Amino acid sequence: MSNHTLSSVERTAFASSHASLCALGTYLRQIDFFAPLEARVHLKQKVCKYTPIQKVEMVFVALLAGAKAITHTSTTLRVDPALQHAFGLPGCADQSVLAETLNAATDQDVAALRTAVEELFQQHSQACRHDFAQDLLVLDSDLAPLPASRKAEGAERCYMGRCRSRTGRKLVRVRAGPYQETVWEAIRRGRTLEGLDLLKEAVTAAERVLGLAGDDDGTRAKRARTELRLDSSWGSTAALNWLLLRGYHVTTKFTSTSRVQKLVRPIQAWQPTASPGREVAAVPEPVRLAKPTVQYAVRTPSKEQAAGYHYAVLVTSRAELPMQAAVDRYDGRAALEAEIKSDKQGLGLGVLRKRKLAAQELLGLLGQLAHNVLIWARGWLTGGAPRLATFGIVRLVREVWTIPGRVTLVGTQVQRIRLSALHPRARDVCAGLRRLIPPSQTRVALA
């Protein structure tokens, strides 16, 4: 981030409610993490006190600090000079100024920020360094509702999950399952459906980010070691055939209810699964697709009918998996839905709303970057604090990066961070930060 020059080199101490987050900001500055953002994102807005990219970075830091609205920057970042210095910010703009900057974003600014976010992903993600010889890379994709006001650009009255008919937009996300990283996401109009065109857009974007695009032998071999787990809404014949011919492994469920009823009708014997009440059986006459697949019927007791069942047909190209393992593997896709929910609770996804679609997309990309930074930072800490490896987004935001303490600066550089020993996570976080940040640059200790 941009350096703030004090009038003279002096030692200054600040109390901070986010001292642990100050340590993360110090490390990100040391590795020049924000260089792609500053090089690519240039919003056309008049500069009075802060540059547009500085204001964009202020919103990003506020998200890491747990802000659920732009107004929360006044109670998280603006009142914390130590946090501002740690991330290299010269201060914090008023919340109305930050809102104006977001509203000034254009489609070109969104594209520039997306390029920078993808560049950062390629630099720091584990998914881009996946060992395909060791195991398959699993990608999950889903289309989730994002409530919005009726006057918001792109908002339409449509199916919004449990809310049924409500006004909003849709979020399409591709996730690297083993690493809990968001590979790509975008905000679309409310009535967007899980069609083949949207699937192609999402998969093509994920290929670009992960280096899976192209037709050379090496790239084809990587795609052959990549599995896509999709919601049943993407279980059409056209979508399945396109993915199979593209060279991917696929695990999903058929969309058509009439097709499912036809496939399960001849089945007589069912086997229990690990989930109580749910049963599974092999489909005797599977649907022929572009490449060989195995198909299993799954039935679950209906809550509406005393002796009734809900039926589904699971289709997978992973023929080597036993029937029970194939069903359990598809169940792992639910982690994506839980992850989106945790982003809503921890990072304000769906709560931070802008009327202008470009402004909402800019916020979405900052949220995507914040999600990935939290996941990467958890990995950086676990070398010295393995107990943090199981923490999700909500606990990372609320417990790990909200440890209070005292931050000492020499000039603009953070020299020492003392974390409050009374915090239950302070000892683990301190151990992780000590391994991450060399003592010659910044000393981290317990108060």
Report each predicted region and the residues it spans.
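Short acidic (Asp/Glu) and glycine-rich catalytic loops that position anionic groups and cofactors
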Residues: M1-L6, A35-A39, R78-A82, A306-H310, ...
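Short amphipathic alpha-helical "interface-anchor" segments enriched in bulky aromatics
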Residues: Y27, T73, A325-L362, L366, ...
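An anionic, glycine-rich sequence signature occurring as long contiguous blocks
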Residues: Y248-Q345, A431-A447
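An internal, acidic/charged active-site-proximal segment
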Residues: A186-S302
